[in-house]
A protein has these predicted regions:
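Conserved ABC ATPase "signature" region
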Residues: 120-138
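Catalytic Walker B motif of ABC-type/P-loop ATPase nucleotide-binding domains
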Residues: 168-171
Length: 289
């Protein structure tokens, strides 16, 4: 699988040279594969939000570099390549608070308009993006501020999707939503990924949620990468995950408890289906020992 985004020795220091100096990223090396869904997990202050702001050039590294398709996104004069902002789309946490246009269509059209596209192309992208996030066409001329919180979030996501980024970065996309709202957003992401084939990064604090959708998990701890692997491999290090201030899925907890009680089960599982398979395998082997 080819790499679309990469960081090499990426370091970011806030307040460098002052009494308030803080290292937010400490020589981070990651490779993000084209077409994958990567979950980014970490406790508050772990560096995950700083990391994603580097991926589309909102922040400039103190050291190291970010490469898009093998090329640094920063030139020798310290300028970020303009195309980076269009190719790596970033949806901030609580994006509904960033809506500002009079109508939904105009808000979604803001990004494509800045790409200097023909009006016909902009209109087509607005329609396609609304459909992708489940917004009815008749809402196009309505005010985004008249929508529910969940619908506003869909508008904000549609505004980034309309630029057709190669990489879509979502910072805590389900924050503040009820369980039904969270399920809807994750379903939206799954559908968009299936239709577009785009690379997607989802920042979350919930292992339970993110493990259900991600191909790999990037676990941040104290400005460094703790793990970057499949969910199953990551959850095989449950003690280290918990030590980093994170939780593990309930299914994984149950399997670990069964292991402690003498049952020969796989403790790296994290879905109900995987747990059922593990229990059947345990039963065939004779159960507890």
């Amino acid at each position: 699988m080819s790499t679309i985004l990469e960081t090499r020795g990426l370091t970011h220091v806030y307040g460098a040279g002052t009494p308030f100096e803080r290292v937010a990223l400490d020589h981070v090396d990651i490779q993000i594969n084209k077409g994958e869904i990567l979950g980014v997990i970490g406790h508050t202050g772990s560096g995950k939000s700083t990391l994603i702001q580097h991926l589309n050039g909102l922040l400039q590294p103190s050291e190291g570099e970010v490469l898009l398709d093998g090329k640094s996104i920063w030139d020798a004069k310290g300028k970020c390549a303009r195309e980076t902002r269009f190719r790596v789309g970033l949806v901030f946490q609580y994006p509904e608070y960033q809506l500002f246009e009079e109508t939904i269509a105009r808000d979604i059209a803001y990004g494509p308009t800045n790409m200097s596209l023909p009006q016909a192309e902009i209109d087509a992208r607005v329609r396609e993006s609304m459909e992708a996030v489940g917004l009815a066409p008749e809402l196009a001329d309505q005010s985004p501020f008249a929508l529910s919180g969940g619908q506003k979030r869909r508008v904000a996501i549609a505004g980034v999707i309309a630029m057709r980024p190669d990489v879509l970065v979502l910072d805590e996309p389900t924050a503040g939503l009820d369980p039904a709202g969270r399920d809807e957003i994750f379903e939206l992401v799954r559908n968009y990924h299936a239709q577009s084939g785009a690379t997607i990064l989802i920042v979350s604090h919930s292992m339970e949620d993110i493990s259900q959708i991600a191909d790999r998990l990037l676990v941040m701890d104290h400005a460094r990468v703790l793990f970057c692997d499949t969910p199953r491999e990551v959850f095989s290090h449950a003690d280290e995950i918990v030590a980093a201030g994170l939780d593990i899925p309930m299914i994984t907890k149950v399997m670990i408890e069964l292991k402690k009680r003498g049952y020969d089960v796989d403790t790296s599982v994290y879905t109900v289906a995987q747990a059922m398979d593990a229990l059947r395998a345990c039963r065939k082997k004779g159960g507890a020992h």
